[in-house]
Structure formats: structure tokens, C-alpha cells
Amino acid sequence: MGPDPSLAYRPECHEKDKTEFRNFENGDLFDRVFNTYKLMHTHQTLDFVKQKHQVWSNCSHFSLSMMDSIDSLDELVDESDPDVDFPNSFHAFQTAEGIRREHPDKDWFQLVGLIHDVGKVMALYSEPQWAVVGDTYPVGCKFQNSIVFRNSTFEGNPDGKNPAPNTEFGIYEPQCGLDKVLMSWGHDEYLYRVMKFNKCTIPEEGLYMIRFHSFYPWHSNGDYMHLCNEKDQQMLPWVKEFNKFDLYTKSTELPDVERLKPYYQSLIDKYCPGVLQW
């Protein structure tokens, strides 16, 4: 018998040391990753984010089933990811299978693992990757030091020269809640909006995972707590639990997608069936 393929999906058994993930200091993909964040941190202003909400949140661009949207990610390699250089569709199934092993009783959680990055389809419909992928962070207030490449990529951002949004709270009230905070625009917020628009029935915990899984300064570094309300604090453990599968299931051992599809199609049919508006 050959090696157990499930090892590729089990965070606790993964052959890659956890300290090797999210290496933003060197590596074969460093230049690509840095350049993506440089563009993001230069152009993602408060006004830019408001504009993208107007463009994408009405979900009037195209119609596509969830599985077809996942398949479309075969064409996308995330240029902000220092860990992988293969299509995003494989990462979807890796994440879902990792969750399935650890949480076999939570089918909605498994589905979130599968679909969490599907908002990246924006990159296949005219958006540059710096407006789609990568870590997210609030705009309209001080950029915290935990943001990736904080000290080397924001010098060209006009908001950095505006005193109003450069305080700890900026345009927000203390403990206003993340629902009232404008995040840098990307696939997290877009997919959240698609889920709400199409009345998908994924539980609130899953919607939080979708909306904030890329908000590393919050869920992994503990920043921006001054903007969080009680609900955000209650949901944080769920986002943290999701993160370990999102991050540590990445592997060059790619899953047998065709074998897995029927099971995950049944979850799609349960929580976000049919053709969706994007």
C-alpha cells in the first residue's frame, strides 16, 4: 500500500512545519507576493473600497452555480500566497477535507472550507489580484503594524497622508462592531455579500469565517480589538478554528477532486443550491 493520502489534509500530521507557512521574508515566490501587496497597499484607500462595494455588492455581474464557480478557480493562482503555486480550486478541497476529518458532524463547516475563497472569481472578471486576494485590514483608521509588509508598502497610499483616518479609531466609534468597519476590498467581503444576496443558509459562524478569514491582523495578531463588539468576540474562536485548516492543509499532494465532488455537491444543494447571482 502507498502512503495515506489523508495525511495531506490533516493539520496535525502535516509534513511541513507550521513555522514554514506564511513566510513573507524570502522564498521562491517572494517577489510576486511582495509586488501584489505593494499594489494593494498603495491603491486600497477608503474611497476605493466604497467604490468596489458599489460595483460588486449588487451581485449583477454573472450567474453561476457554486460548483462551477469553484471549477473556475482552476484558472487562478493566488499571487499573494507565499505557500502555494497551484490553482486555488485544489486548496478549496484540501481545506474542506481537513475540516471534514476533524468536524465530521458539521457539514456547514466543511462547505465553508470548500467555498471560502470562491470570491476570487472577481479576478477572472476584470479585477486585478491586488483587489481580490491577500490579507485584509480596516481602512479609515490607523494601519496597524501587524499588517503584512506594513513598513515597506504603504508610503504611496493617499490615506496615509490624511490625518482624519490615521488615528486609532479613525472614522469609527469604539466597539462599533466589525459589521460597521470597511475592510480592504477582496474576496472575503465579496463572497459574504453573495451569500447574503442569494439567501444561502450557512450559519452565522460560517458567514463570519467567510467574511473575516483573511483578516490576519485580527484573528492571528489580536489587533483591532478596540473596534470589536461582543458578537465579534464570540465569533473569533470560530474564525481561529477555521484558520488552522485554511492555512495548514496546503500541500503539494493534490486531492482527487472528481472523487470528492458528489459529496460536496450534496452540501451545496443543501445550503446554497442552484444558480447564484454574482
From Swiss-Prot:
InterPro entries: Inositol_oxygenase. The keyword Ligase does not apply. GO terms for molecular function: ferric iron binding; inositol oxygenase activity. Its EC number is 1.13.99.1. This is Inositol oxygenase. It catalyses: myo-inositol + O2 = D-glucuronate + H2O + H(+). Belongs to the myo-inositol oxygenase family. It comes from the Eukaryota. The gene is miox. Pathway: Polyol metabolism; myo-inositol degradation into D-glucuronate; D-glucuronate from myo-inositol: step 1/1.
